[in-house]
Design a protein with these regions (language model features):
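A helix-centric hydrophobic-segment signal that preferentially recognizes long
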Residues: 2-186
Length: 186
């Protein structure tokens, strides 16, 4: 009779541990989802800023149609991207196009001196800082989640409960490029 109780005790302990591991992994997964939603908010703000920036530049550099079209195409692509990997690739293209757009201000002193352009470029720089901070938080949450599903003994239950590795938010740039915030000078 006592071995029966021991077996029941071991089973109860395993079930309790499985519930604990499951709840911890769910919490880590929710943290990743929330962190990605935070990035998404910042990216949407940047997407909303772009048409105003393009219109301002268009007023001073209308013959730079190729650059303006590149920015609009990259914005549309970024807005339709889904998931960290696809969003990261689309946002990388958008960042490059925005960099070329901002660089136009060097060739057009009147544009560079325009108060609206200065305000929009300043807002863009602030958003880039917020995006970088949100990206670091997201990647930290992904690292913690991926570690959680790989550590023993939770790894025994992770696959059974359907927990899989999550992708980092990668902009396809080197670490120094990602951590270097664009500097907008007037």
């Amino acid at each position: 009779m006592s071995t029966g109780w021991i077996v029941i005790g071991v089973i109860v302990i395993l079930v309790l541990f499985a519930f604990g591991a499951y709840n911890r992994l769910v919490a880590l997964g929710q943290r990743v989802s929330q962190a990605f939603a935070d990035i998404d908010v910042q990216l949407k703000q940047r997407h909303d800023l772009i048409p105003n920036l393009v219109e301002t530049v268009k007023g001073y550099a209308s013959h730079e149609r190729g650059t303006l079209d590149d920015v609009i195409k990259a914005r549309n692509s970024a807005m339709s991207a889904q998931g960290p990997a696809q969003v990261g690739a689309a946002e990388n293209q958008l960042s490059g196009a925005l960099g070329r757009l901002i660089a136009l201000s060097e060739a057009y002193p009147d544009l560079k001196a325009n108060a609206n352009f200065q305000q929009l470029a300043g807002e863009l720089s602030d958003l880039e800082n917020k995006i970088a901070a949100s990206r670091r938080f997201f990647n930290n949450a992904v690292q913690e989640y991926n570690t959680g599903i790989q550590q023993m003994p939770a790894a025994l239950f992770a696959g059974m409960f359907g927990f899989t590795r999550k992708d980092f938010f990668d902009l396809g740039a080197s670490r120094t490029e990602v951590e270097t915030v664009p500097n907008v000078k007037f």
